[in-house]
Amino acid sequence: GVSYFSPRFGFTCNMVENFEVVLANGDIVNANATSHRKLWKALRGGSNNFGIVTAITLRVFSQGKFWGGQTFHPISTRKDHFHALENLIAAVPYDKYAHFINTIVITNASYGNWFIGNSLQYTKSDPPTPFPETFKPFTDIPRVALFPGAPDNTLRVDNHTAFTLEYAALNVYPKRWQFATISFGNSAEMMEDFFQMANETIQPFLTLPGFLLSVAYQPLPTLMSERYGEVDSLGPIQTQGNMFYIHWAMSVDGSEVETDRKFEKVTRDLFQRAEAKAREKGLRRDFLQLTSNGTLKELWRVSKEYDPTGMFQKQVPGGFKLSEMDEDSMEL
């Protein structure tokens, strides 16, 4: 996935130099660039399909304290954010120290009202750069406290661990989550179109216990989508120009089991309508996170080689699975 450092170093999975993996037959292998290379490539983005990963060796780099945090804004400012995000994505050259996510959220706790929570990290350090010019279009947008007495931002200079713990604290109790993703060509107008369709879609669910929807608009400039030419299973290197992608996360309390199929249906319908709208505007794009249709056949073959009985397809629940796919009918 995308990290604070992806503009400089690429997707997180591509930082993995070695996977120690327990296979379905009990063998322990090391998958890397020179040994079990096909398995290494598959695990770089192929999810939980091939074995139990018991150790990971990551490429590392030096990183000091940096500036970042969250800012909170009224939903009425969303078009200002969308235009600023479009310009950020289109910047030439793209600022490799800039990590930004624009998230619009609606939840029971906000009484059914949308709000905006931005995540800004500027990873230049030694020394850090507070309020960099790159983020000025966002930091100039009026902010608001989410609740009386609460801060309207958490911006500061801190270390990576502190920023990670800040976001981890947002998920404090078990919930039922649905995740989805779609990408579009860089367009503030398409960002607004998606918001309007999402708002219409979720209205029937606002009173469900623990309901929350987070729609994150994430930049995907070409220097990230080209992935520095790394070997992985995220699909072909993209040549469709600057993009943004949506990370959709909808949840309710853990007891609301009956909502699963409803959520899946309405989300599929929404994404189909959004894709049709994007096609009309010439903004449809192929990129999908986690994996791509262009790599499914290769992943299927790796699964058959390393897990011929399909144990990790049939006995490990959850996540993206290959077990329902027929090699001969797959599109390439």
From Swiss-Prot:
Record Gene3D superfamilies: 3.30.465.10
Description of what induces expression: Expression is up-regulated during the late stage of P.nodorum wheat leaf infection and is controlled by the cluster specific transporter elcR.
Catalytic activity, EC: 1.-.-.-
Protein's name in the database: FAD-dependent monooxygenase elcE
Keywords, in A-Z order: FAD, Flavoprotein, Oxidoreductase
Gene Ontology MF: a single term: flavin adenine dinucleotide binding
Function: FAD-dependent monooxygenase; part of the gene cluster that mediates the biosynthesis of elsinochrome C, a perelyenequinone phytotoxin structurally similar to cercosporin. The first step of elsinochrome C biosynthesis is performed by the polyketide synthase elcA which catalyzes the formation of nor-toralactone.
Family recorded in the similarity comment: Belongs to the oxygen-dependent FAD-linked oxidoreductase family.
Recorded metabolic or biological pathway in which this protein acts: Secondary metabolite biosynthesis
InterPro entries: FAD-bd_PCMH-like_sf (IPR036318), FAD-bd_PCMH_sub2 (IPR016169), FAD-linked_Oxidoreductase (IPR050416)
Disulfide bond sites: none
